[in-house]
Amino acid sequence: MLVDSSIPQLVVPIEGWVRENIAVTDTKNKEQYRFGMPGPMIKEQEWKKTLEQLEAVLIEGDILVASGSLCPGMPTDFFASVSKIAGDKNVKYILDTSGEALLKGARTGVYLLKPNLGELATLCGVKTISFLELESIAQTFLKNNPCEVLVVSLGPQGAVMLTAQSVDYISAPIVCQKSTIGAGDSMVAGMVLALAQGKSLQEMSKYGVACGTAATMTSGTQLCKRKDVEELNDWISSNSSTSQKIKINV
Protein backbone atom coordinates (compact mmCIF):
# COMPACT_ATOMS: atom_id res chain seq x y z
CA MET A 1 0.00 0.00 0.00
CA LEU A 2 2.81 2.42 0.85
CA VAL A 3 4.59 1.62 -2.41
CA ASP A 4 1.39 2.12 -4.40
CA SER A 5 0.95 5.51 -2.72
CA SER A 6 4.58 6.49 -3.51
CA ILE A 7 5.37 6.96 0.18
CA PRO A 8 9.11 6.66 0.98
CA GLN A 9 9.91 3.98 3.55
CA LEU A 10 12.76 3.05 5.83
CA VAL A 11 12.35 -0.50 7.06
CA VAL A 12 14.24 -1.88 10.06
CA PRO A 13 14.36 -5.70 9.66
CA ILE A 14 13.48 -7.86 12.67
CA GLU A 15 13.73 -11.59 13.20
CA GLY A 16 10.09 -12.10 14.18
CA TRP A 17 6.92 -11.80 12.12
CA VAL A 18 5.05 -8.51 11.98
CA ARG A 19 2.10 -8.67 14.37
CA GLU A 20 -1.52 -8.74 13.30
CA ASN A 21 -4.58 -7.26 14.98
CA ILE A 22 -8.02 -8.73 14.39
CA ALA A 23 -11.40 -7.01 14.51
CA VAL A 24 -14.67 -8.96 14.57
CA THR A 25 -17.96 -7.20 13.86
CA ASP A 26 -21.25 -8.58 15.21
CA THR A 27 -23.59 -7.46 12.44
CA LYS A 28 -26.68 -8.39 14.46
CA ASN A 29 -25.88 -6.32 17.54
CA LYS A 30 -23.71 -3.74 15.73
CA GLU A 31 -20.84 -4.38 18.12
CA GLN A 32 -17.16 -4.65 17.28
CA TYR A 33 -14.56 -6.72 19.11
CA ARG A 34 -10.84 -6.11 18.73
CA PHE A 35 -8.03 -8.53 19.46
CA GLY A 36 -4.69 -6.77 19.71
CA MET A 37 -1.74 -9.13 19.51
CA PRO A 38 1.40 -8.38 21.55
CA GLY A 39 3.70 -8.94 18.60
CA PRO A 40 7.08 -10.68 18.33
CA MET A 41 9.92 -10.42 20.82
CA ILE A 42 12.09 -7.50 19.71
CA LYS A 43 15.80 -7.95 20.34
CA GLU A 44 17.87 -5.18 21.89
CA GLN A 45 19.91 -4.65 18.75
CA GLU A 46 16.69 -4.34 16.73
CA TRP A 47 15.05 -1.57 18.76
CA LYS A 48 18.39 0.21 19.15
CA LYS A 49 18.81 0.08 15.36
CA THR A 50 15.39 1.73 15.06
CA LEU A 51 16.55 4.65 17.19
CA GLU A 52 19.78 4.94 15.21
CA GLN A 53 17.92 5.01 11.89
CA LEU A 54 15.47 7.57 13.23
CA GLU A 55 18.25 9.86 14.38
CA ALA A 56 19.93 9.55 10.98
CA VAL A 57 16.92 10.57 8.87
CA LEU A 58 15.24 13.30 10.96
CA ILE A 59 15.93 16.91 10.03
CA GLU A 60 14.85 20.17 11.63
CA GLY A 61 11.26 21.06 10.84
CA ASP A 62 10.05 17.47 10.43
CA ILE A 63 6.92 16.16 12.13
CA LEU A 64 7.43 12.84 13.90
CA VAL A 65 4.56 10.58 14.98
CA ALA A 66 5.09 7.68 17.39
CA SER A 67 1.98 5.58 17.89
CA GLY A 68 0.78 2.20 19.04
CA SER A 69 1.91 -0.17 21.76
CA LEU A 70 5.42 -1.49 22.32
CA CYS A 71 6.25 -5.08 21.41
CA PRO A 72 7.72 -7.49 23.99
CA GLY A 73 11.41 -6.87 24.55
CA MET A 74 11.19 -3.12 24.00
CA PRO A 75 11.90 -0.92 27.04
CA THR A 76 8.98 1.06 28.44
CA ASP A 77 11.03 4.24 28.02
CA PHE A 78 11.46 3.67 24.26
CA PHE A 79 9.24 6.62 23.37
CA ALA A 80 11.17 8.72 25.88
CA SER A 81 14.33 7.91 23.91
CA VAL A 82 12.50 8.98 20.75
CA SER A 83 11.56 12.21 22.52
CA LYS A 84 15.20 13.01 23.23
CA ILE A 85 16.10 12.48 19.58
CA ALA A 86 13.19 14.68 18.48
CA GLY A 87 14.31 17.42 20.86
CA ASP A 88 17.90 17.31 19.61
CA LYS A 89 16.67 17.50 15.99
CA ASN A 90 14.13 20.25 16.75
CA VAL A 91 11.18 18.39 15.23
CA LYS A 92 7.52 18.37 16.29
CA TYR A 93 6.96 15.11 18.16
CA ILE A 94 3.43 13.69 18.37
CA LEU A 95 2.89 10.75 20.71
CA ASP A 96 -0.18 8.49 20.59
CA THR A 97 0.21 5.51 22.91
CA SER A 98 -0.96 4.33 26.33
CA GLY A 99 0.12 2.90 29.67
CA GLU A 100 3.65 3.14 31.04
CA ALA A 101 5.03 4.00 27.59
CA LEU A 102 2.76 7.06 27.50
CA LEU A 103 3.73 8.15 31.01
CA LYS A 104 7.45 7.99 30.35
CA GLY A 105 7.22 9.45 26.87
CA ALA A 106 5.10 12.40 27.95
CA ARG A 107 7.37 13.31 30.85
CA THR A 108 10.42 13.53 28.59
CA GLY A 109 8.86 16.07 26.26
CA VAL A 110 6.44 16.10 23.34
CA TYR A 111 4.88 18.69 21.06
CA LEU A 112 1.41 17.13 21.01
CA LEU A 113 -0.40 14.37 22.87
CA LYS A 114 -3.73 12.86 21.77
CA PRO A 115 -5.10 11.00 24.78
CA ASN A 116 -8.68 9.95 25.38
CA LEU A 117 -10.20 10.67 28.79
CA GLY A 118 -8.94 7.40 30.25
CA GLU A 119 -5.39 7.97 29.04
CA LEU A 120 -5.45 11.56 30.30
CA ALA A 121 -6.55 10.24 33.70
CA THR A 122 -3.54 7.92 33.71
CA LEU A 123 -1.24 10.81 32.82
CA CYS A 124 -2.66 12.92 35.63
CA GLY A 125 -2.71 10.18 38.27
CA VAL A 126 -6.49 10.11 38.77
CA LYS A 127 -9.04 7.33 38.31
CA THR A 128 -11.49 9.13 36.06
CA ILE A 129 -12.06 12.58 34.55
CA SER A 130 -15.50 14.04 33.95
CA PHE A 131 -16.22 16.63 31.28
CA LEU A 132 -16.59 19.26 33.99
CA GLU A 133 -13.10 18.52 35.33
CA LEU A 134 -11.42 18.19 31.96
CA GLU A 135 -10.31 21.77 31.40
CA SER A 136 -8.75 22.34 34.82
CA ILE A 137 -7.02 18.95 34.96
CA ALA A 138 -5.67 19.25 31.43
CA GLN A 139 -4.40 22.78 32.01
CA THR A 140 -2.63 21.63 35.18
CA PHE A 141 -0.98 18.85 33.18
CA LEU A 142 0.22 21.32 30.54
CA LYS A 143 1.59 23.59 33.24
CA ASN A 144 3.59 20.82 34.90
CA ASN A 145 4.81 18.82 31.89
CA PRO A 146 6.87 19.50 28.73
CA CYS A 147 3.91 19.34 26.33
CA GLU A 148 2.69 22.21 24.15
CA VAL A 149 -0.63 20.89 22.87
CA LEU A 150 -3.21 18.44 24.23
CA VAL A 151 -5.92 17.14 21.92
CA VAL A 152 -8.26 15.08 24.08
CA SER A 153 -10.38 12.71 22.03
CA LEU A 154 -14.02 12.47 23.08
CA GLY A 155 -15.03 9.82 20.56
CA PRO A 156 -18.25 10.63 18.68
CA GLN A 157 -18.56 13.89 20.64
CA GLY A 158 -15.43 15.33 19.02
CA ALA A 159 -12.37 16.58 20.89
CA VAL A 160 -10.98 19.33 23.09
CA MET A 161 -7.75 21.05 22.06
CA LEU A 162 -5.85 22.79 24.85
CA THR A 163 -2.73 24.92 25.03
CA ALA A 164 -1.45 27.13 27.84
CA GLN A 165 -3.39 30.04 26.32
CA SER A 166 -6.66 28.63 24.99
CA VAL A 167 -9.23 25.87 24.97
CA ASP A 168 -11.12 24.79 21.84
CA TYR A 169 -14.08 22.45 21.82
CA ILE A 170 -14.43 20.70 18.47
CA SER A 171 -17.89 19.29 17.88
CA ALA A 172 -18.33 16.23 15.69
CA PRO A 173 -21.50 15.74 13.64
CA ILE A 174 -23.66 12.66 14.02
CA VAL A 175 -22.86 10.28 11.16
CA CYS A 176 -23.79 6.75 10.16
CA GLN A 177 -20.96 4.74 11.71
CA LYS A 178 -19.89 1.56 9.96
CA SER A 179 -16.60 0.90 11.79
CA THR A 180 -14.37 2.70 14.26
CA ILE A 181 -11.21 0.92 13.08
CA GLY A 182 -8.49 3.45 12.36
CA ALA A 183 -10.50 6.46 13.54
CA GLY A 184 -7.87 7.55 16.06
CA ASP A 185 -5.01 7.06 13.61
CA SER A 186 -6.96 8.97 10.95
CA MET A 187 -7.44 11.82 13.39
CA VAL A 188 -3.70 12.02 14.02
CA ALA A 189 -2.98 11.82 10.28
CA GLY A 190 -5.36 14.68 9.61
CA MET A 191 -3.71 16.85 12.24
CA VAL A 192 -0.26 16.10 10.84
CA LEU A 193 -1.37 17.04 7.33
CA ALA A 194 -2.80 20.32 8.59
CA LEU A 195 0.40 21.11 10.50
CA ALA A 196 2.51 20.32 7.45
CA GLN A 197 0.36 22.74 5.45
CA GLY A 198 1.03 25.50 7.99
CA LYS A 199 -2.50 25.66 9.37
CA SER A 200 -3.28 27.01 12.85
CA LEU A 201 -3.74 24.72 15.84
CA GLN A 202 -7.48 25.39 15.72
CA GLU A 203 -7.64 24.39 12.05
CA MET A 204 -5.42 21.41 12.78
CA SER A 205 -7.68 20.00 15.49
CA LYS A 206 -10.83 20.51 13.41
CA TYR A 207 -9.34 18.76 10.41
CA GLY A 208 -8.21 15.92 12.64
CA VAL A 209 -11.73 15.42 13.99
CA ALA A 210 -13.06 15.54 10.42
CA CYS A 211 -10.66 12.76 9.35
CA GLY A 212 -11.41 10.64 12.40
CA THR A 213 -15.16 11.00 11.94
CA ALA A 214 -14.92 10.28 8.21
CA ALA A 215 -13.03 7.07 8.97
CA THR A 216 -16.03 5.75 10.93
CA MET A 217 -18.20 6.15 7.82
CA THR A 218 -16.34 3.42 5.92
CA SER A 219 -16.49 -0.34 6.46
CA GLY A 220 -13.79 -2.54 7.95
CA THR A 221 -10.27 -1.21 7.53
CA GLN A 222 -11.09 1.21 4.71
CA LEU A 223 -9.60 4.68 5.03
CA CYS A 224 -11.55 7.92 5.13
CA LYS A 225 -12.65 9.50 1.86
CA ARG A 226 -11.50 13.00 0.95
CA LYS A 227 -15.00 14.15 -0.03
CA ASP A 228 -16.36 13.10 3.37
CA VAL A 229 -13.46 14.79 5.16
CA GLU A 230 -13.95 18.12 3.39
CA GLU A 231 -17.71 18.14 3.98
CA LEU A 232 -17.27 17.27 7.65
CA ASN A 233 -14.53 19.87 8.08
CA ASP A 234 -16.86 22.57 6.74
CA TRP A 235 -19.54 21.54 9.24
CA ILE A 236 -17.10 21.34 12.14
CA SER A 237 -15.61 24.76 11.33
CA SER A 238 -19.09 26.26 11.64
CA ASN A 239 -20.03 24.47 14.85
CA SER A 240 -16.97 24.65 17.12
CA SER A 241 -16.09 27.05 19.91
CA THR A 242 -12.85 28.88 20.64
CA SER A 243 -12.23 30.91 23.76
CA GLN A 244 -9.80 31.69 26.52
CA LYS A 245 -12.11 29.91 28.94
CA ILE A 246 -14.78 27.47 27.83
CA LYS A 247 -17.23 25.48 29.92
CA ILE A 248 -17.80 21.93 28.78
CA ASN A 249 -21.34 20.88 29.60
CA VAL A 250 -22.28 17.29 30.23
Where are these regions (language model features)?
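Conserved N-terminal subdomain of the carbohydrate kinase-like
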Residues: 1-62, 230-250
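Short hydrophobic/aromatic-enriched beta-strand-loop microsegments
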Residues: 6-12, 111-121, 168-174
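Short, small-residue-enriched loops and turns at beta-alpha junctions
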Residues: 40-43, 70-74, 101-103, 158-159, ...
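Conserved phosphate-binding/catalytic region of the ribokinase-like
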Residues: 84, 103, 131-250
